[in-house]
């Protein structure tokens, strides 16, 4: 707690302030005016995103219209304190020695990226909090598989699904099936917790299917594939593929452009009388991607993506390589922080080099592309987190071995194995979704998983130290 408070005071004096501007300008949000005046209606007709985060922020904006930024700041600061305690508690559940757990927790909470996300009104911080809380809830269920503990765990999983489409219905179904298999005597408890959650998620998907012909919680998938395919084409490649009939001229337009860019490609959707659907732009001036016209564009972008996957997959390979490169970047290395990161430049560079292994830093992603274009591809790994590039796969392999190899699996208590398996599955599932279906901001998507990576690092360090001390207990990590 002392390290958390001291770091926040120092960051404040360095000029780090809470940024609530995303509420007004980020694509993920509905219009703030609609949050205040037509929140329930707007959430019902929201299809571009799951409704959970807009519900939470919308309630703050609705009840504190002139001071919502201050209220959100307090909420995020409280989340920061809770995240620190949850991370420490999670390692204690695994019986990681106090000095290791405390050291890793301090490094996590003083990390510039963690502090910057704590001061940005976007959903990374709440998702990180929910993931840590869900892990602890699962540990409680594994130790005492009651209906109450099952309800607690699946309620938190529901909150994750309603907040970001990265946590898909398939994710929930797999978790439910796994718990049914692992706890055969507690199947009633698992089903009582899981079935209502699955039904609610299915209802959300069904609502979007009925209204928008898309069985999903988020209709961005089609256009998002364009980011990983046609957006990766050079202008010359795009022209050649258009002339060859491989893709349509839409390939020349970056995905998620404003509606004016698509005149002549699709007809505007008819007015509905529902502002969250009818707006071309929000009252704050950014494109309203919830406009049904974009649904037609999603289909067109997806058709182009399918052609790219089949006839010119090199474009998709570029996206995957960029995604993995970005995945290992320090969490502070994001364009969202371009205005504030210079205020902590010295400490950020020190932390990124010593902890993450980022030995060189580019001013922007455009600079990285210029380095590659100039024949400097072999130098690019020094611009990402080299320690992360090596360390995170090793942690995944180590955790997998703990579950797969009988001679080490038997050292763990059942609740420890279940929790480790859950963290590992969540890391692999969310990472695969992020890195194969998106590009550029993958270190942002990784940030919510860094809590799990930190816990696994604590387990691995403890196991390494214990292995070098003959005669110590071998049960679990100790």
Provide a role label for each language-model segment.
Residues 105, 150-164, 175-176, 196-205:
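Membrane-interface alpha helices of multi-pass inner-membrane proteins
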Residues 12-31, 44-59, 66-70, 215-218, ...:
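Extracytoplasmic catalytic/substrate-binding loops of multi-pass membrane glycan-assembly enzymes
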Residues 69-75, 290-291, 301, 307-310, ...:
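Membrane-interface anchor segments at the N-terminal boundary of transmembrane helices
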Residues 99-100, 137-159, 188-192:
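Short hydrophobic alpha-helices at membrane interfaces in multi-pass membrane enzymes
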Residues 74-95, 133:
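Transmembrane-helix motifs of polytopic, lipid-linked glycan transferases
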Residues 11-36, 193-299:
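Juxtamembrane membrane-water interface segments immediately following transmembrane helices
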Residues 37-48, 52-78, 95, 113, ...:
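Juxtamembrane segments of multi-pass membrane glycosylation machinery
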Residues 48, 71-79, 103-133, 138, ...:
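Multi-pass, polyprenyl lipid-linked donor-dependent membrane glycosyltransferases
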């Amino acid at each position: 707690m002392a390290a958390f408070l001291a770091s926040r005071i120092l960051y404040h004096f360095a000029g780090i302030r809470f940024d609530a501007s995303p509420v007004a300008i980020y694509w993920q949000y509905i219009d703030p005016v609609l949050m205040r005046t037509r929140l329930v209606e707007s959430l019902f007709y929201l299809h571009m995103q799951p409704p959970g985060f807009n519900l939470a922020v919308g309630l703050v904006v609705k009840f504190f219209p002139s001071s919502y930024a201050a209220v959100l700041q307090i909420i995020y600061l409280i989340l920061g304190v809770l995240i620190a305690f949850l991370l420490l508690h999670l390692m204690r559940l695994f019986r990681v020695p106090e000095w290791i757990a405390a050291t890793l927790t301090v490094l996590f909470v003083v990390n510039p990226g963690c502090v910057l996300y704590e001061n940005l009104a976007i959903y990374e911080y709440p998702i990180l909090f929910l993931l840590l809380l869900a892990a602890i809830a699962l540990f409680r269920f594994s130790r005492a598989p009651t209906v109450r503990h099952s309800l607690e765990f699946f309620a938190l999983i529901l909150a994750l699904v309603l907040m970001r489409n990265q946590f898909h219905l398939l994710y929930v179904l797999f978790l439910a099936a796994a718990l049914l298999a692992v706890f055969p005597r507690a199947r009633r408890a698992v089903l009582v917790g899981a079935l209502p959650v699955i039904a609610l998620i299915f209802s959300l998907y069904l609502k979007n299917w009925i209204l928008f012909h898309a069985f999903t919680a988020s209709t961005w998938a089609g256009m998002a594939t364009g980011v990983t395919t046609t957006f990766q084409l050079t202008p010359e490649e795009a022209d050649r593929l258009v002339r060859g009939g491989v893709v349509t001229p839409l390939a020349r337009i970056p995905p998620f452009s404003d509606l004016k860019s698509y005149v002549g490609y699709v007809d505007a959707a008819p007015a509905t009388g529902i502002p969250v659907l009818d707006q071309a732009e929000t009252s704050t001036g950014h494109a309203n991607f919830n406009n049904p016209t974009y649904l037609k564009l999603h289909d067109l972008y997806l058709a182009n993506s399918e052609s790219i996957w089949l006839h010119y997959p090199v474009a998709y390979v570029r996206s995957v390589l960029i995604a993995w490169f970005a995945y290992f970047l320090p969490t502070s290395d994001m364009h969202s922080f371009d205005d504030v990161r210079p205020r902590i430049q010295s400490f950020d560079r020190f932390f990124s080099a010593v902890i993450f292994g980022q030995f060189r830093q580019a001013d922007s992603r455009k600079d990285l592309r210029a380095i590659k274009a100039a024949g400097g591809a072999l130098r690019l790994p020094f611009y990402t987190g080299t320690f992360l590039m090596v360390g995170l796969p090793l942690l995944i392999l180590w955790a997998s071995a703990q579950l797969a190899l009988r001679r080490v699996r038997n050292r763990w208590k059942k609740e420890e194995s279940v929790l480790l398996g859950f963290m590992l599955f969540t890391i692999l599932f969310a990472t695969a979704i992020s890195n194969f279906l998106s590009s550029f901001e993958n270190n942002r998507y990784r940030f919510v998983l860094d809590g799990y990576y930190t816990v696994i690092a604590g387990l691995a360090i403890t196991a390494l130290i214990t292995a070098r001390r003959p005669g110590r207990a071998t049960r679990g990590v100790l």
